[in-house]
Regions:
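Conserved S-adenosyl-L-methionine
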Residues: 63
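Class I SAM-dependent methyltransferase SAM/SAH-binding core
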Residues: 67-130
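Short alpha-helix
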Residues: 219-241
Length: 409
């Protein structure tokens, strides 16, 4: 399928207009309260540093779609409470220019419509496989990408684009890479493949389960990366451009809540984990733990492909399971099991479990209509999310892999 065709169809279907989060669709609760939060916390230190040095920022969003990168960057709260007229770091008066570059004419048109009232915003059609757009412009402070937009490029194309960015950028500029991780539990069929191959992907998760037919869904090819492969490609681009680059952050995102965990396009079992975490974040829904206690046995035939990835997935899955077991024990008033879970967990996780136990046992302190929906469920989801965010450097075992790079000239 031509690279832009599905996106143009998605725009026409309304997926890229202004949406509210919810239980299903492109901007579900996991997107807003897990994935967006992960991106924002990852870029926040660099954003705070840039704003401390520069009056107005210049931003280039690569694979911008309809401009969601602008929404992400302008809704990052400060790391410490401060007295300010705005709750967010990057306000409109601190933006000199936001340039959104995308291959899809429909996306560019939608972006122009979405932000027609903002004079600092511009959108351009650009094929990133052919190189960096807007090179006639002064250097940008942030070269941004999100939600795996750069996985549309081959290894060679990403290296070429990176070298051009490094040449164009100024000292202190930040580059944000966001690509698909190859070792995600969503697609074990890709684990044995090479980064040099572009492999099948689809956005069939936007369809209702009964319409998720591999024979009728629109497929296109993308590049799936490991953490080491991405860093090496960035370093090769730095060498090719004669630019020193510093990797600031390398993180996996959505390890167990990736979009395709709840589909069968790339694996034999359909889980309901993302849907259940959507319920946890939904403050109007009294959920349960069904679907949260996961079996990853379907990965057994693939685990030997990478011992490091296998260990990372096992450790994260073990911590995830400890949270859910503790929650189930609390609901059964099984205090012995709660105590056992806390005492057998690593220190940081034990503190989270103590917090959840305290909340559950003090529900009467919270004057809300539904304690589970309003307080307990969202806190459980945040603990699961924070477990992921506190993991070591990314290996490529999430739906997405994000890497922040600083230019040193």
């Amino acid at each position: 399928m031509r690279r832009t065709e599905f996106y143009e169809t998605a725009v026409k279907a309304g997926f890229y207009g202004v949406e509210r989060s919810g239980m299903f669709g492109k901007k579900d609760n996991v997107r807003k309260y897990w994935e967006d939060v992960s991106i924002k916390t990852t870029v926040r230190p660099a954003l705070e540093s840039l704003l401390a040095q520069t009056a107005k920022l210049r931003i280039l969003d690569l694979g911008a779609g309809s401009g969601e990168g602008l929404e992400l960057l302008t809704h990052v709260p400060p790391s410490e409470p401060v007295e300010s007229a705005s709750p967010f770091l990057l306000t409109e008066d601190r933006i000199e220019v936001y340039g959104g570059a995308d291959l899809s004419p429909a996306m560019v048109a939608q972006g122009k419509e979405n932000y027609a009232d903002r004079p600092y915003v511009q959108f351009v059609e650009a094929d990133l496989s052919q190189g960096l757009p807007l090179t006639q412009e002064p250097p940008f402070h942030i070269y941004f990408s999100s939600y795996s937009s750069l996985s549309h490029l081959t290894v060679g194309e990403l290296e070429q684009l990176s070298a051009q960015i490094f040449t164009h950028a100024d000292n202190g500029s930040i580059v944000v890479y966001d690509v698909h991780g190859r070792y995600s539990p969503e697609w074990p069929i890709h684990w044995s493949r090479s980064v040099e191959e572009q492999l099948p992907y689809n956005m069939g998760y936007l369809l209702p389960p009964q319409e998720q037919d591999p024979g009728t869904v629109d497929w296109f090819n993308v590049t799936y990366w490991t953490g080491g492969e991405l860093v090496e490609a960035i370093r090769r681009a730095g060498a090719a451009s004669g630019t020193q680059v510093k990797v600031l952050t390398l993180k996996d995102r959505s390890i167990l809540v990736g979009r395709h965990m709840d589909t069968c396009f790339f694996k034999p079992v359909r889980l309901s984990v993302r849907g259940q975490v959507n319920h946890l974040f939904d403050r109007d829904y009294r959920g349960d733990t069904a679907g949260l206690m996961l079996s990853l046995d379907y990965l057994d035939d693939y685990r030997s492909l990478s011992r490091e990835v296998d260990l990372r997935l096992r450790e994260y899955h073990l911590s995830w399971s400890a949270v859910i077991r503790t929650l189930e024990a609390l609901r059964r008033t099984d205090n012995a099991r709660v105590r056992e879970s806390i005492e057998s967990s690593p220190a940081a996780l034990a503190e989270d479990l103590k917090m959840l136990a305290w909340l559950y046992r003090n529900a009467d302190r919270f004057r809300v209509l539904d304690f589970w929906a309003s307080v307990m469920g969202p806190q459980v989801a945040c603990v699961l999310r924070n477990l992921e965010q506190n993991l070591p450097d990314g290996l490529g075992c999430g739906h997405s892999l994000v890497c922040l790079v600083e230019i040193c000239k």
